[in-house]
């Protein structure tokens, strides 16, 4: 049963994403579903999700943020739980400062190559746009391991018990492409 990218997400999908996040993170690290939905509703490139047999299998939030928010994230002084629509930058505001807010695959759908599929779909809208860099804020050891596998550099601990990572956009794209040419592990 292959995973398929969901062409148009609904508020219910965002509620399902929030429920999936709660399996891994405390609520203090999660942007409420209604707020994430508001980003997507105005900026549909901000979130990509996939399903298997009608069940949410995973998702990625990758989107441009205002330069001041990027710097606050980078410095470890902004918890994206408090991210609001006004913090998301329109893709016309270039160059783009990207934030990889979350990438999560449900445990039962791991080892299917879904991370690669989600990242490829998430990168597509930005392919021809000038992006400066990408920052991520990792709450778990698995998140830190993901960031390191994908070539991010650990910058510092945040003021909200997480780790901040960053890399150039060009490097991130190359690392995603490199990892996408490696076949998924056998089950």
What are these regions (language model features)?
Residues 141, 149-151, 156-187:
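C-terminal "cap" of GNAT-fold acetyltransferases
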Residues 17-22, 36, 126, 147:
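Hydrophobic alpha-helical core bundles mediating ligand binding, dimerization, or RNAP-core interactions
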Residues 2-17:
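A short beta-loop-alpha structural element at the N-terminal edge
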Residues 105-110, 134-145, 158-162:
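Conserved beta-strand-loop-alpha-helix junction that forms the acyl-donor binding cleft
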Residues 26-57, 61-67, 82, 87:
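Active-site rim helix/loop that mediates acceptor-substrate recognition in acyltransferases
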Residues 97-98, 119, 126-139:
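Conserved GNAT acetyl-CoA-binding A-motif
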Residues 105, 111-124:
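Conserved acetyl-CoA-binding loop-helix of GNAT-fold acetyltransferases
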């Amino acid at each position: 049963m292959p995973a398929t990218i969901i062409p148009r997400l609904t508020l219910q999908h965002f509620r399902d994403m929030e429920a999936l996040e709660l399996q891994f993170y405390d609520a203090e690290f999660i942007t409420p579903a209604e707020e994430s939905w508001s980003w997507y509703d105005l900026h549909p490139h901000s979130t990509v999700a996939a399903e298997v047999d009608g069940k949410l299998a995973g998702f990625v939030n990758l989107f441009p943020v205002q330069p001041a928010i990027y710097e606050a994230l980078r410095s470890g002084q902004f918890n994206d739980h408090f991210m609001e629509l006004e913090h998301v930058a329109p893709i016309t505001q270039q160059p783009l400062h990207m934030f990889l807010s979350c990438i999560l695959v449900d445990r039962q759908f791991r080892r299917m190559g879904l991370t690669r599929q989600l990242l490829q779909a998430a990168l597509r809208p930005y392919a021809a746009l000038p992006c400066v860099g990408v920052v991520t804020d990792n709450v778990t050891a698995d998140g830190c391991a993901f960031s390191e596998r994908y070539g991010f550099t650990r910058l510092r601990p945040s003021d909200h018990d997480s780790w901040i990572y960053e890399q150039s956009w060009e490097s991130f794209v190359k690392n995603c492409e490199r990892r996408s040419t490696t076949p998924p592990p056998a089950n």
